[in-house]
């Protein structure tokens, strides 16, 4: 059966049951006029009051997703979404040992991502720097971490939300505890 969806909206909605949590930090990345990754928005989003306080953090205009009620889509062997697809994953970033960091291949992440990585915005600033052809919704579940962009570093911690719009970035944990992040990756056209 074929289903047509017109004007569909995909919204990331964060619901919070705690009456004391009134806002959430949201960081949205974008490309500037020189193709550099920047933090376009970095501020607080206030939860709408109600029985289940919530805040709409980002909206895109389309995402027809096929439904599968039998296959385990989480068993697929890739972290990146397929063409026109999505991927949901949790990543735990251990603290980065400075000695190991110094020995890293400058194109470490680009080699891992391979052909799916856009070629604009190179060379990379750090071995962990990468860029995928996706919009990524990220929620820091625990710990804290630095998000390196082309010309800045944004420090995020548990409870912060990031929207990556196919920009160069690296996740660098310079702390002493692991940082766990939930990612929803959505395939997008080449920026």
Pin down the residues of each PLM region.
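Boundary at the C-terminal end of the N-terminal hydrophobic targeting segment
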Residues: 19-21
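Ligand-binding loop in jelly-roll beta-barrel domains
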Residues: 86, 144-146, 153-157, 166-190
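Double-stranded beta-helix
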Residues: 27-32, 36-41, 112-119, 174-191
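N-terminal secretory signal peptides
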Residues: 24-64
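A short beta-strand-loop-beta hairpin characteristic of the jelly-roll/cupin
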Residues: 124-126, 130-132, 137-158
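Conserved short histidine dyad/triad with adjacent acidic residue
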Residues: 44-45, 89-132, 165-168, 187-189
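Bacterial N-terminal signal peptides
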Residues: 7-17
